[in-house]
From Swiss-Prot:
The keyword Membrane applies. Keywords: Host membrane, Membrane, RNA-binding, Transport, Viral movement protein. It comes from the Viruses. InterPro entries: TBSV_p22. It is found in: Host membrane. Disulfide bonds: none annotated. The lineage of its organism: Viruses, Riboviria, Orthornavirae, Kitrinoviricota, Tolucaviricetes. This is Movement protein. The keyword RNA-binding applies. GO terms for biological process: transport of virus in host, cell to cell. One of its GO terms (cellular component) is membrane. Belongs to the tombusvirus/aureusvirus movement protein p22 family. Its main location: host cell.
Length: 190
């Protein structure tokens, strides 16, 4: 299977401008990671898979966001995926407001649609409601995005899935002190 990733720099919807503020996207292509710069506006990532026929479903979506600024900077935003197979740019999935000053890893089992293998997979990835004290062009975070393709002879849809948080920096730090206290109490009673 020959997989090609390309970046297209043209507005898909003049009413909506994506603000990614000069960040980088790392896309896994086979065994190699390819780094693609995210532009301040009109960022559109498309995937083309060269196959003889059939339908593609995107499965096991994994996203890791690593901050490149101070935690106290107050950088936040919502991560979304959009379907641009029609002109409305229907929002497929959107997270809650994320604190982008802390590392976070998200996963989703699948996207709930399939498309012809002869066309581009119509997924737009980006951030909205992005709040940052920095000027445009400053790298705020790096994003790594990985997924697998599910192939089928027939077109079908899957039940809706939600983002799950695999890892969140502060959540793990909050658990560590309580585990240490419990361990020390049991040790002293022995």
């Amino acid at each position: 299977m020959d997989t090609e990733y390309e970046q297209v720099n043209k507005p898909w919807n003049e009413l909506y401008k994506e603000a990614t503020l000069g960040n980088k996207l790392t896309v896994n292509v086979g065994m190699e990671d390819v780094e693609v710069p995210l532009l301040p506006s009109n960022f559109l990532t498309k995937v083309r898979v060269s196959l003889s026929g059939g339908y593609i479903t995107v499965r096991r979506v994994r996203i890791k966001i690593i901050p490149l600024v101070s935690r106290k900077a107050g950088v936040s935003g919502k991560l979304y995926l959009r379907d641009i197979s029609d002109t409305t740019g229907r929002k497929l999935h959107c997270t809650e407001l994320l604190d982008l000053g802390k590392e976070i890893r998200l996963t989703m089992q699948h996207l709930d649609f399939s498309v012809s293998a002869r066309s581009d997979v119509p997924i737009v990835f980006g951030f909205e409601d992005l709040v940052s004290p920095y000027l445009e062009g400053r790298e705020l975070f790096s994003v790594s995005l990985r997924w697998q393709f599910g192939l089928s002879a027939q077109c079908y849809s899957l039940p809706p899935a939600k983002w799950k948080v695999m890892y969140q920096e502060d959540a793990l730090k909050a658990l560590k002190p309580s585990k240490i206290k419990k361990a020390s109490k049991t040790d002293s009673s022995v």
